Amino acid sequence: MPLILFFLTFSVFIYASSPSIEFEEVAPGIFVHQGEHLDVDETYHGDIANIGFIVGEESIAVIDSGGSLKIGNELKTAIRKFSKLPVRYVINTHVHLDHIYGNASFVGENVDFIGHVELPKAMALRKEFYERINLEYLDVPNDQSIQIAPNILIKPNESKIFDLGNRKIKVTAYSIAHTKTDVTIEDLNTKTLWAGDLLFTERTPVIDGDIHGFIDVIDKILMLDIDLVIPGHGTPTKKWKEAFLKEQNYFKLLRDEVRLAIDNDQDLQLTIDTAGQSESEKWELFDIQNGRNINKIFPTMEWE
């Protein structure tokens, strides 16, 4: 037996007996596990993102697989509590490690992995960095931090339809926003949108792509005909327009205050200390993430 398959089989056996993550059916046939609001630098354990699955009449689609093989195996075991149908697709909403490292749990016959056309390259570029995090926080050796890249790729501003059996889902890819690898998944039966990290509720939004692109993508999503949104982090909401507008307002404020700081020749550290502070009571982990967002956008905006 090849080593990678032995490892995957062995790991499934270890973790299958005691799943520790719980799922809620937020719409008919749509199950979500909410990750904890923890920062990667603070007690990261691979379970900080929302993950879940959609059950059709013939098959199942997994939406994000978690931050470790352990979480992926617990997800796989939990699915069997709700359905005996096969997992047909695993869809990653973007490249961040808390959403992709459970993929290896689902390797098998007739399982396709779906993602943004830029996702395979982005995963490869971050592989060594992610391995260091997995080793430091999860005690996972590098040779056991297994990346499974998508084999079905979607280009920006394009959508593809996949049928789970009388249940069609639409996967749409975007230009740079939260990252360069963002996709959303729309369940057409229930008008439910899995937004990935294009939406944060409660937790401070993260910019790892482009703030202007993020603002623009939110405008596009606001035009959709949907009833429920599942964010990448936080509570699913039917008040989804308010949630996106709250996030977008934060970005617009941050953009404008960083631009003003640059125009006034204010340095990066002072800008980190001051920009966006009026939003501090509205978001969790604000003191950690707001500064990172400024550190990301300040150098780019200096050249605008």
What residues fall within each predicted segment?
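C-terminal regulatory/interaction regions
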Residues: 263-304
